[in-house]
UniProtKB/Swiss-Prot annotation:
Keyword Amino-acid biosynthesis in annotation: yes
Enzyme class (EC, first level): lyase
GO molecular function, one term: indole-3-glycerol-phosphate synthase activity
Catalytic activity: 1-(2-carboxyphenylamino)-1-deoxy-D-ribulose 5-phosphate + H(+) = (1S,2R)-1-C-(indol-3-yl)glycerol 3-phosphate + CO2 + H2O
PROSITE patterns, per the entry: IGPS
PANTHER family per record: INDOLE-3-GLYCEROL-PHOSPHATE SYNTHASE (PTHR22854:SF2), TRYPTOPHAN BIOSYNTHESIS PROTEIN (PTHR22854)
Species this chain originates from: Alkaliphilus metalliredigens (strain QYMF)
Enzyme Commission code: 4.1.1.48
Keywords: Amino-acid biosynthesis, Aromatic amino acid biosynthesis, Decarboxylase, Lyase, Tryptophan biosynthesis
Protein name: Indole-3-glycerol phosphate synthase
CDD domains: IGPS
InterPro entries linked to this entry: Aldolase_TIM, Indole-3-glycerol_P_synth, Indole-3-glycerol_P_synth_dom, Indole-3-GlycerolPSynthase_CS, RibuloseP-bd_barrel
Amino acid sequence: MILDKIIRYKKNKVKEEKVAVPLGEIMKQIEDMEEARNFKAALVGRESISMIAEVKKASPSKGIIKKDFNPVKIAAEYEKNRVDAISVLTEDQFFLGDNRYLQDIRKMTTIPLLRKDFMIDAYQIYQSKALGADAILLIAAALTKKEMIAFQKIAAEIGIYSLVEVHNKEELEMILETGAEIIGINNRDLKTFDTTLDRTAELLPFIPKDKIVVSESGIKTNQDMKLLKNYGINAVLMGEGLMRADSIGEKLRELRSGLCD
């Protein structure tokens, strides 16, 4: 399965990173860093649906998504079009991301940044803060309940937010027991990479009303956005649809059309 391959690769990658930049060095780096931007606040209180726009070059299922890929230029377009948060893929082997993308984007925008990667070691949480992330993605399919609790605690202690991702009811029940506040429903099955917005509709009734809900993956049209707004979700995370657009600005305007009526 793709997820298993990614996790195996990630474990080896993190071992190398720990040698290259020891945790003690990262801890020193984050001591004097500015307070994280409020990722949580960016996802609530909007008349429309909040937009987390993703900087994404490729994926295991689709290959290269954007050939002319300039992460800083893409982030600038997102800022110009007033997205609420930016997701930056840093996984290098399967998604062709890079930690430098996050660092470079941090320097040019004040929008809250989500580090999109596969967190399997506490080291990566501290690393995320040092790279400039305001929030991290924690994937239920990749973590035990014990790890999920510990990782959310570490993130909170160093002042960054956790977007906790689920794909099925079993994962949802597990993460609700860990106190997750921002819940992402991944419409894409990470084991098969099949995608359907029905996943959001199926899981939403089981999520307490005080949670912030983000629908992720498979969102392509204004009709999709209106459907998700009717479901009552707070935000969407969108990557491929924006990356494939001839004009990011025009695509965002199309997606948002009529949502504030």
